[in-house]
Amino acid sequence: SAVAMHIKGTPKDMQKDPQYDDLMAEIISYFENVAWKANVAGIKQIIIDPGIGFGKTVEHNLQIIKNLSDLKRLDTPIMIGISRKSMIGKILNTDDVNDRHEGTITLNTISVLNGAHIIRVHDVIEGVRTAKIIDAYRKA
């Protein structure tokens, strides 16, 4: 298995006015191409990460989270990395990463409910507790 992450541009220029004609369609097309290349290379399963914060505006990131279920058609696990991201700081108007816990938990919860299978976190205990609550909710 391998994790493949979407990025628009390169780390040097990715945040310089990122533009998309159709955000989700471009991300899906990217992963279809990656899956084909991975298969040719003998990698049978990839985990996809839409790359929150990598060549995307806050609005793009929120659109991805809102439409995460669109990626289910790729029939592969979806990983999301939102933990402490600057987008949370921008939404909450704070530069302090210690003020991003609630935003991380909220967006992780929404992401899992919208189709994410894996959440990448800095705060493992809070992440596990969030997952347990989501599991209990789904089983109710």
Role assignments for model-derived ranges:
Residues S1-V40, G55-A140:
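Active-site-adjacent loop and "lid" segments of alpha/beta metabolic enzymes
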Residues I52:
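Active-site metal-binding loops of divalent metal-dependent hydrolases
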